[in-house]
Amino acid sequence: MTNFTFDGAHSSLEFQIKHLMVSKVKGSFDQFDVAVEGDINDFSTLKATATIIPSSINTKNEARDNHLKSGDFFGTDEFDKITFVTKSVSESKVVGDLTIKGITNEETFDVEFNGVSKNPMDGSQVTGVIVTGTINRENYGINFNQALETGGVMLGKDVKFEASAEFSISE
């Protein structure tokens, strides 16, 4: 069994969504945690739970962030966390239940496992993964949108994300 300690200072969770049919808006969740258990040498034994604090959303625009925290989007007064609980893990895919605003759907995401390294600062063993994927926000009750005079809508329904997580590990 491998002991995993999440390193939030060396991890990130970023997303992007199409805006006005012509560009992308990017942002991040600044507070999240990932708990992992299992044997790093046997991916089939790995189980993980990611917990994201949606009120930590950061798009570098306070007014937009406040709107994203409202009931039009994440409803952070009522729904204080987003969770992803794995069902299966391989070296290239992770399948699990994603819950946003109390709505749970099974999702499959891509995984890039980056091996194990020794941290020269303290001698600890570290590992990292990058998880990428796309979710349809409307599947989670995030339906806010506005029609554009030129056709199309203000916001795309697909949200792309990249989560980079680093862990100290020990046996």
Curated annotation (Swiss-Prot):
Gene3D superfamilies: Lipid/polyisoprenoid-binding, YceI-like. Disulfide bonds: none annotated. InterPro entries: Lipid/polyisoprenoid-bd_YceI, TTHA0802/YceI-like_sf. Signal peptide: none annotated. It comes from the Bacteria. Belongs to the UPF0312 family. This is UPF0312 protein SAS2572. It comes from Staphylococcus aureus (strain MSSA476).
